[in-house]
Amino acid sequence: MIKKIIVVVAFMLTGFSLTAMSASAEEITDLFLQKEVTYSGVEGGKIGENWKYPQFVGEKAVDGDETTRWSADKQDEQWLIVDLGEVKNIGELVLQLHAESPVYEILVSTDGESYQSIFKEENGKGGQPTKKYIDGNNVQARFVKYQQMKMWQHTNKQFYSSSIISFEAYEKKRLPEAIKLLTENLTISEKRKQQLAFEVSPAGVDITEDQIEWSSSDPTIVTVDQTGNLTAVKSGEAKVTVKIKGTEISDTIPVTVVAENKQYAEMRAKWKMRLLGTTQYDNDADVQQYRAQIATESLALWQTLNQAADREYLWERKPSDTVSADYTTQFTNIKKLALGYYEPSSELFEKPEVYDAIVKGIEFMIDTKKYNGTYYTGNWWDWQIGSAQPLTDTLILLHDDLLNTDAEKLNKFTAPLMLYAKDPNIQWPIYRATGANLTDISITVLGTGLLLEDNQRLVQVQEAVPSVLKSVSSGDGLYPDGSLIQHGYFPYNGSYGNELLKGFGRIQTILQGSDWEMNDPNISNLFNVVDKGYLQLMVNGKMPSMVSGRSISRAPETNPFTTEFESGKETIANLTLIAKFAPENLRNDIYTSIQTWLQQSGSYYHFFKKPRDFEALIDLKNVVNSASPAQATPMQSLNVYGSMDRVLQKNNEYAVGISMYSQRVGNYEFGNTENKKGWHTADGMLYLYNQDFAQFDEGYWATIDPYRLPGTTVDTRELANGAYTGKRSPQSWVGGSNNGQVASIGMFLDKSNEGMNLVAKKSWFLLDGQIINLGSGITGTTDASIETILDNRMIHPQEVKLNQGSDKDNSWISLSAANPLNNIGYVFPNSMNTLDVQIEERSGRYGDINEYFVNDKTYTNTFAKISKNYGKTVENGTYEYLTVVGKTNEEIAALSKNKGYTVLENTANLQAIEAGNYVMMNTWNNDQEIAGLYAYDPMSVISEKIDNGVYRLTLANPLQNNASVSIEFDKGILEVVAADPEISVDQNIITLNSAGLNGSSRSIIVKTTPEVTKEALEKLIQEQKEHQEKDYTASSWKVYSEALKQAQTVADQTTATQAEVDQAETELRSAVKQLVKVPTKEVDKTNLLKIIKENEKHQEKDYTASSWKVYSEALKQAQTVADQTTATQAEVDQAEAKLRSAVKQLVKVPTKEVDKTNLLKIIKENEKHQEKDYTASSWKVYSEALKQAQTVADQTTATQAEVDQAETELRSAVKQLVKVPTKEVDKTNLLKIIKENEKHQEKDYTASSWKVYSEALKQAQTVADQTTATQAEVDQAEAKLRSAVKRLTLKNSGENKKEQKNGGNNGHLNTSTGVDQTGTKQVKPSSQGGFRKASQFLPSTGEKKSIALVIIGLLVIASGCLLVFRKSKSKK
């Protein structure tokens, strides 16, 4: 492609005017195009004689192709020289950079030896794309050199060099061809002002303010000054023109001035209500708490605001903030300060000095910090969204005050926003905005439109925003199955999707009822995603981590999207927005879902605490108050989200999610130093949700072993932070079939493009109550280990116990919890019993996985890890295990004997199971056959028998290649009862046309030749065991026995027809009816009935247990025989004799009175003792003995021996009581120094010295308040406080001590047995196979005295903490 610039009109610059030179077109060609270049290096360097990355060589900078680039080597000093072949006049240079260096210059030479600089950049936007137009000043040169002096640093801490898309040169400097106002027509209210902006073409031509002329056709209606600031004087129409002086180049727009449009005031009022709330719930505790939060936060910001005349910042920059992130923080702080100014309960309410500080703060950010609409560095998001939105909110709050007192300031403050958010479709600096980014930018465009009452800005929003509602089949956007993708191929319902909901919801609710309301039919796509991708996706009010991308690595309360509950709270706020304009049925579903989630999570999470704004809080209150909690109904759902390789099944007991990736979907996103260890989060990770709400929530991602995530098959080799981020798999077989009740899910795991050679075929068969996990074809080598992680579950050791058992075929492990609903069982064949089971304690910080959104907290969690280790090398490895939830150990043991399913095949070609009426299969290759199903293509199939001869078959094409896939059914299809339109039938072959289905399933119901059913015949044969030949006449028995023999023959025949079966059943029933019994002598039951009657008087309480058992069994048998019409005389006589014998052996319980006098007396005497007076160990023995004594005393059936034993044990327990020493402790000096140092104030001292002092003072006060503190503790607290006082340093003393932060260390739970080198407890198989009992891994108890001392210490600490808590509470 030849690069040319067509100049329509050329001008010569004279002073501050432009003089026309020519009206004819002149063609100017790029002098550098295809010229010879030399350069210092290429990214990646050389391998032998060749560049590692030939696509980045220097020639690409002058090849005329804007899709190629030169990428310099990673060194500070890098250069590229273009040889023109001869000396040329250079009027202008154009440098288009893919990534700009911080420091570089352009030099020229005529001989290639001596160079002179004509341009130098010393403040380049490191790493950002940019285009520079450089004045050549008609210099004469043959050689032009680009010289980089400094690399730029990425947020991943790596350094990179320049990357040049194109380097161009032209003989003549380009002059303006056209000028265009950015507003095509303007409607403005009376007395309003607006700053007009323009652009000159071609891009890069510099025009100064002095060269521009502004004019109005009617100054009585509109005036415009020479900076383009327009004022609406009165109603009417006029035209405003901008012109380049000395030329005919100009642009004119019509301006209509109208009386104030009340719609603008109404929309600003809606916006303001979101920020300041209403009086509707002023008596509500949560609303009052939020108002108090606003007041507290704003006061703290007011007290820390830097108001110095020569200030360089408003608030000190947070350590974790980048330069650009600090802008977002500063504008957010200004907004919070403004909220305090307008909040009636705040100390800052309507204080003039606060208002003045807010206005001056905004001016400081625009004038001094250059938030001016053109400057930016670092992350584009902070400029266009992060800073723009809180500034817009602030200006909405200030609007009325600014308009009445200083309208010029309103225009000035809005002007940068008009440039940063010029158009909803433009993402800085040169990209097209999509999805959530578009709606976020649109919020600022809408806000500025409302601030300036600019119709065109609202039209921009009205036209641009509905584009996010379109249903897409690739890239960013909404998908028909409920998926939401951002950044091209990452699942993001959780964060970016939520931002889209919020952005669209806020915009639509503000525009609703106005002239600019959005009425786009594609809004139905949004409602569909809200239903499938939010209501059906969320679990217990939590947004699953598997759809939240890199936001899972953020510390709580550092961002709206952090933990699953925090993201869930943000989602609920957004759903309440959508409900305001949703169809009634969806609105009802939203309300029911929210009520259900709040009910499910109970008191574990407070959804009303720290809302994002008043609107979110009030809307949630409205939902809760709209109906009774009884309406809350858990939603059951099963979704295969083929467009984002995610699966979620929800039922009443649990939910399970599966996270995968493929050729279509990325493995994980790492960016801005976030999610540094997300390597394996899509390698088939399984999320099992029950009533354990802490699972996958706060602290989980900071402590979980990132190499061993539940459900994954992994190569555990060490990986660098962010390694292989954004990789898509070489394989596309990921997904599965789903009939709404069960699902057959599979993943072809292939790590070959991530520095590993591991491959595996993984399947999950999701039944109602069972998860069947199969793996096959596991092949790979590593210098670490290859493992399958059955689970790695965060547990509470004091609540969860590890159990195990085995049967002849299968073994099992369970995690039994305090809440039985949280029990989890794992059943696996004995071939899998070489499992590693570990209880592991791990510590970590969010700073370990994210450097952007962090807190200071170190988390420590315990994990139960169950894994199969294949070693360093594995070929065609497999696994099989069943996961169940909410089952007792007895139920899990029973499952190990009868799992309820059969694995039909588990190979690299086919994985299939049969369970009840289902056959489920994932075929990885062509031509696979199992259980009467022949799959011609790789596919996923569920066959369900719904009646005799009636089947529902569900098919899916997980390859998503739009091809047709077929299966042959051996039953012989007689009729198609129902079928989705994408399914066709040809004889017994069923074909799915998968084009456009994105992996989703389709079903068909067919009738086949009915199967021969023998159940009734087999049952009838079984019932005949009671008949005996001696009881019937010979002739009737002959007919019967022949019919029975024939029935058995038919039952055993595999080829018998249904007619033969039915005939055999009929003949056998007839033969049974004709049986004639041999006459029998009348049986006499008189004596039996008499003895039964005589012995009904006996009562169990009067006899010993053993004698009563014999008697009661004999009586029961006698009654049974007496009731039988077929009992023989021998049976009657035997029952009578047995009962008489049982009556004789009855032994009466002794009736001697038990004496409890002494026991009751000693219980009474010892009620005076109090726990606080005795050591913990002695009190434990005493309290248990006292409890047992009281139990025996209360028992009416206690024997004298039991009473005497209880008395003896209690007396012994009383004697061993050990009193706590009561020596008086002297706290005089400690209390004195505390009193003397209450005068100090934090503002007078350096932060580091104050921290040491305040902690010492706090500890001293704690010890002083403790009634159980020892003299040593008192003395130590006093010494520590005296030392801290001495070290206090005044702020003006010049000392600047660096504060150190201590990081957390990963810890492991050590036990007395089975500890490996990492400090984790190994639960290994015993020599007999299976596992040792959990009790074998209990730690050694040590001496009783040591335990006692530990308990005493813990009690002292706990008492102190309680006193401190009460004291701090009273101070508040």
Curated annotation (Swiss-Prot):
Report the Pfam families cross-referenced here.
Big_2 (PF02368), F5_F8_type_C (PF00754), FIVAR (PF07554), Gram_pos_anchor (PF00746), Lyase_8 (PF02278), Lyase_8_C (PF02884), Lyase_8_N (PF08124)
Key word Disulfide bond present in the record? no
Q: Which InterPro entries match?
A: Big_2, Chondroitin_lyas, FA58C, Gal_mutarotase_sf_dom, Galactose-bd-like_sf, GH-type_carb-bd, Invasin/intimin_cell_adhesion, LPXTG_anchor
Q: What is this protein called?
A: Polysaccharide lyase 8 family protein HylA
> What factors induce this protein?
Expression is up-regulated by 5 kDa hyaluronic acid (HA) in vancomycin-resistant strain V587 cultured in human urine.
- Function of the molecule: Has a very modest degradation activity against heparin sodium salt (HS) in vitro. Involved in the pathogenesis of vancomycin-resistant E.faecalis infections.
Q: Compositional bias (Polar residues) at which positions?
A: 1308-1329
Please give the organism.
Enterococcus faecalis (strain ATCC 700802 / V583)
Question: By its UniProt entry, which CDD domains does this protein fall under?
Answer: GAG_Lyase
Q: Which residues form the signal peptide?
A: 1-25
Q: Which positions does the record annotate as the modified residue Pentaglycyl murein peptidoglycan amidated threonine? A: T1341
Positions annotated as active site in the UniProt record? H487, Y496, R550
Sequence motif: LPXTG sorting signal, positions: 1338-1342
NCBIfam families noted in UniProt? LPXTG_anchor
Residue ranges of the BIG2 domain? 183-242
> Could you tell me which residue ranges the FIVAR domain spans?
1014-1075, 1084-1146, 1155-1217, 1226-1288
Does Signal appear among the keywords?
Answer: yes
Summary of the knockout phenotype:
Deletion of the gene in vancomycin-resistant strain V587 leads to significant defects in bladder colonization and in spreading to bloodstream in the mouse model of catheter-associated urinary tract infection (CAUTI). Double deletion of hylA and hylB genes in the same strain leads to a significant colonization defect in both the kidneys and the spleen in the mouse model of bacteremia.
Give an example GO biological process. carbohydrate metabolic process
Q: Which family does it belong to?
A: Belongs to the polysaccharide lyase 8 family.
Example of a GO cellular component annotation carried by this entry: extracellular region
Q: What is its main location?
A: secreted
Recorded E.C. number(s)?
Answer: 4.2.2.-
Which residues make up the pro-peptide?
A: 1342-1372
Q: Which PROSITE patterns match?
A: FA58C_3 (PS50022), GRAM_POS_ANCHORING (PS50847)
Residues in domain F5/8 type C? 63-172
Which parts of this chain are annotated as the region Disordered?
Answer: 1288-1336
